[in-house]
A protein has these predicted regions:
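Positively charged n-region of N-terminal signal peptides that target proteins for export
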Residues: 1-4
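Sec/Tat signal peptide C-region and signal peptidase I cleavage site
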Residues: 16-21
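Asparagine-centered strand-capping/turn motif at beta-strand->loop junctions
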Residues: 61-68
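Intrinsically disordered, low-complexity Pro/Gly/Ser/Thr-rich segments with frequent PxxP/GP/PP motifs
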Residues: 79-117
């Protein structure tokens, strides 16, 4: 009987809809976002190295506020060693209410490595709901495919 209740509890927990966490409000942040320009997989070869799978990555920045605009002031792409590879913005970009933008790292671009990242800086005139900042890392060739997201994380105030 106890097993039946545990099983029922597990089914109910898995079947119930997930509750979204409320978004915080902020007037600006620096957001760290992981990027995977490649991942290691498979078995080690004769040189004790795994195989490398190249991925493309799309950075998505989404203004979640239905009433206020935000300004994306900087989108910088760094490699595994923390070296700046590319500054994606030449000038600040305004995102209106509920608007989105994206940046793309090509499949053939493996310069970032397994520890690549974006630093995204944004600001608003006053506190707005925090944007969603994430990457979609993907590999789609023939019958094989792989895709996963990496969530951005706001850094402590004053971090750049």
């Amino acid at each position: 009987m106890r097993t039946a209740f545990l099983a029922l509890g597990l089914v109910l927990a898995l079947a119930s809809p997930a509750v979204a966490e409320p978004l915080e409000r902020s007037a600006g942040q620096t957001v760290y976002v992981p990027v995977y320009s490649h991942i290691w997989h498979g078995n080690l070869d004769a040189e004790q190295k795994p195989r490398q799978l190249l991925l493309s990555s799309m950075l998505s920045i989404r203004n979640t506020d239905p009433k206020a605009s935000m300004t994306v002031s900087s989108v910088r792409y760094y490699d595994t060693n923390g070296r700046l590879l590319r500054d994606f913005l030449q000038k600040p970009m305004e995102l209106g209410p509920m608007a989105s933008t994206d940046m793309f790292v090509e499949h053939k671009d493996d310069a970032g490595g397994t520890g690549a990242n974006f630093l995204v800086e944004w600001k608003a005139a006053g506190p707005i709901s925090e944007p969603i900042v994430e990457t979609v890392n993907a590999y789609f060739f023939g019958p094989q495919s792989l895709a996963f997201t990496s969530q951005g994380r706001a850094l402590p105030a004053g971090t750049k």
